[in-house]
């Protein structure tokens, strides 16, 4: 028999959980978006097909697609204007975490757990489907001007994680004048502008506010809650850049 007192306690517990004050059970979480990171370069002739695929993924509601341009192709005749040493370092960290022998482009990393050649669509889609079945933390993200507010609920028996802020441009178009893609007009979607750690999640309910000039009105923002910095992504949220 359900008593009125029991019912009120249940309602209060549910309200507290929604507010983030009650830790989630270890297996309890939402089915949020899957994070796909493409490591690419405008100097790589194998990358345009992967760039096009990422642009398609960027239009999906169940995927957070991010394009990380690496700098180790720059010596081949064309300096990718969006390449960043930090992006190459992030890819190398994944290499070590996943036990890979080398870094390469185009590479897609899915939820920080698995990887595939970026232009092999079927392989990447299988990884996305598998990732979508895993429970994940429901991450809240609100932006006002150059300030964001991030909320992450608590979870029992959780390992510490880094909260990353990734700022990205919607689309960049570049006429490549040298290198393997000389003469091509390269279209890159969700090009990463900056990546920065903005906090740590220790398993307890978290709310943090962060302000950065990088959060310009014409850029998008993604927040990744990721174990060990470049380990499995536990949850993520995104604010899309404007369409015009």
Predicted regions and their residues:
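N-terminal export leaders
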Residues: 4-9
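Sec-dependent N-terminal signal peptides
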Residues: 10-16
């Amino acid at each position: 028999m359900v008593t009125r007192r029991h019912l009120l306690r249940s309602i209060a517990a549910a309200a507290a959980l929604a507010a983030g004050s009650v830790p989630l059970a270890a297996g309890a979480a939402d089915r949020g978006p899957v994070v796909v990171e493409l490591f690419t370069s405008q100097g790589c002739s194998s990358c345009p097909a992967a760039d096009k695929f990422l642009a398609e993924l960027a239009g999906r509601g169940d995927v957070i697609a991010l394009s990380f341009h690496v700098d180790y192709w720059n010596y081949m005749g064309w300096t990718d204007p969006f390449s960043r040493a930090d992006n190459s370092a992030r890819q190398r960290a994944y290499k070590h975490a996943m036990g890979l022998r080398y870094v390469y482009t185009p590479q897609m990393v899915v939820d920080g757990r698995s990887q595939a050649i970026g232009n092999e669509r079927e392989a990447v889609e299988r990884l996305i489907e598998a990732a979508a079945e895993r429970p994940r933390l429901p991450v809240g993200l609100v932006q006002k001007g150059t300030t964001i507010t991030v909320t992450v609920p608590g979870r029992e028996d959780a390992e510490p994680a880094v909260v990353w802020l990734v700022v990205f441009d919607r689309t960049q178009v570049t006429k490549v004048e040298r290198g393997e893609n000389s003469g091509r007009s390269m279209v890159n979607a969700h090009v990463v502008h900056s990546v920065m750690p903005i906090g740590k999640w220790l398993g307890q309910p978290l709310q943090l506010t962060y302000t950065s000039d990088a959060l310009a009105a014409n850029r998008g923002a993604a927040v990744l809650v990721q174990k060990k910095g470049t380990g499995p992504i536990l949850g993520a949220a995104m604010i899309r850049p404007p369409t015009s």
